[in-house]
Structure formats: structure tokens, C-alpha cells
Amino acid sequence: MKKTTDQKINLVISADHGGFELKENLKKFLAQKYPELNIIDVGAYEFDAEDDFPDMTSELSEEIYQGKADKGIAICGSGVGASIVANKKKGIRAAVCHDVYSAAQGVQHNNMNVLCMGGRVINISEAENIVSSFLEANFISENKYVRRLNKINKLD
């Protein structure tokens, strides 16, 4: 997380019914461990077995696209659907990560800005570790990573 200590980092978070419980638990964890975060919750705001992940995830992507958020965490049942939807928006680099290595490396090598997870795949303890890896990693601005990122950005 790179902002000065007096600047809040805006993190947008979303979930459908498959990730609602995990999202609510993560919000508590984030508020406690990362007080420098401004957490923007774009839903779901209550458990609804009939809600659809594209609605919440597209709102999450829009927040980042509009510059209202720096990073995002999108949760659905598997993380896959959220990843597909998030990547539809220009400037979004989303990936499903269910381990700490991928979460950190996704940021370090690819400047990933949206972490997608499956609420039916991982438990809260695993999710906390993965989220920490995602938030604490920084893009490595070596030539090869910058070159690759530029190629990715041209695909937008």
C-alpha cells in the first residue's frame, strides 16, 4: 500500500450471497489491522440467495475506474465469476487468488488491483492472510515488469 501516512487508501469491497459472510468478516479484520484504509462497501448489504455477483462486481470496478478507489476485493462463490466481470472494465487487473504467493506476486509483477476470492473455497483465516499479502505488496518497477504491464494496458 503506497500512500503517505496521512492519506487514506480507498479499498472497495463487494460480494454476492456466496461471499457475503466472508466479506463481512473481512471488513472487521481490515478495520482492525489496516486503520489507514477507507473501506467502501458496494454490496451486498444483506444476505440474499437471489442476488447476482455481476451487479456488485461491476459497481466495484466502476469505483476503481472512476478513481474513487485504489484497490478492490471482489468475492463470489468461487471468485471466478467476480474476476471475469471485474476484468471487463478498462484499467482493471483482477485475478482469483486463493494463496498468499499469487496474491503478492499478482501485485508485484502485474500490478493487480482487484483481488477475487471464493467464499465457498477458503476460510476467513486463509482469506485474511491472502488479503494481507495483496495489500502489503507493491508493484516492482523493473523494466521487464513495466514492459509487460504496458503490453497488458494496450489490450484495454
Residue positions per predicted region:
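C-terminal binding/interaction regions
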Residues: 6-21, 100-156
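SAM-dependent methyltransferases
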Residues: 1-10, 33
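Short, structured active-site "lid" loops
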Residues: 54-74
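Short active-site oxyanion
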Residues: 10-11, 69-72, 91-93
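Mid-chain, well-packed structural core segment of small domains
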Residues: 74-120
